[in-house]
A protein has these predicted regions:
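Conserved class I S-adenosyl-L-methionine
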Residues: 54-63
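Conserved SAM-binding motif I beta-strand of class I
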Residues: 77-82
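Conserved SAM/SAH-binding beta-strand->alpha-helix loop
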Residues: 84-86
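A short, conserved alpha-helix within the catalytic core of class I
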Residues: 131-144
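A conserved beta-strand element that flanks and buttresses the S-adenosyl-L-methionine
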Residues: 124
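Conserved beta-strand signature within the Rossmann-like core of class I S-adenosyl-L-methionine
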Residues: 152-160
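Conserved alpha-helix/loop element of class I SAM-dependent methyltransferases that forms part
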Residues: 35-54
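Conserved SAM-binding loop of SAM-dependent methyltransferases across substrates and taxa
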Residues: 64-75
Length: 175
């Protein structure tokens, strides 16, 4: 797993967005605050009808915690897992500063969520699948998510790259 890579990224990040590698692929510049707010608002909008005070949310690949900081106040529990211990330590500090008592953090990769011994109403993965090793890993993660979802819960995979456009995207970045 790429734990060391993400620990180094998080350890050297100067702000919340860079913790998770949130930089423009074309110029390596950080995304603007407006772009980041729009990204978080989009995820919130997609989950709006499922957000209740009793909701139990799991974010797989919590990264910088941008989404968590917005959604956690709207639910009963907000759990997040990430392979980077440094990311989780930084998020824990942010949560304590904001007196967020419902945030739970776990040092697991996406295929290790079965270690979290509870069910969720919402499972969210945003800008994570592009880091998966392939289809089989994705299948395993989907199976694990289904096992963790409670009753009529929802699993949201957001901000997914279009695989059919991978080669043209890669070429455009190199130009």
């Amino acid at each position: 797993k790429d734990r060391l890579l993400w620990d180094v990224q998080a350890d050297h990040a100067e702000n919340q967005a860079v913790i998770s590698g949130w930089c423009n692929s074309y110029n390596n510049q950080e995304f603007s605050n407006e772009e980041l707010k729009e990204y978080v608002a989009n995820s919130r909008h997609k989950l709006e009808s499922y957000l209740t005070p009793d909701a139990r949310i799991l974010e797989v690949g919590i990264g910088s915690g941008m989404i968590a900081m917005q959604l956690a106040p709207c639910c009963k529990t907000y759990s997040g897992c990430d392979i980077s211990k440094i990311v989780l330590d930084k998020l824990d500090g942010m949560a304590k500063e904001r007196k967020m008592n419902n945030l739970r953090l776990y040092p697991y990769a996406a295929d290790e969520i079965y270690h979290i011994q509870e069910k969720f109403d919402i499972i969210l993965m945003s800008s994570v699948t592009e880091y998966f090793s392939g289809y089989n890993y994705l299948r395993k993660v989907i199976e694990r998510c289904i096992e963790q979802i409670d009753g009529k819960g929802v699993i949201l995979f957001a901000d997914i790259f279009d695989l059919d456009k991978k080669d043209s995207y890669r070429q455009s970045v190199y130009q």
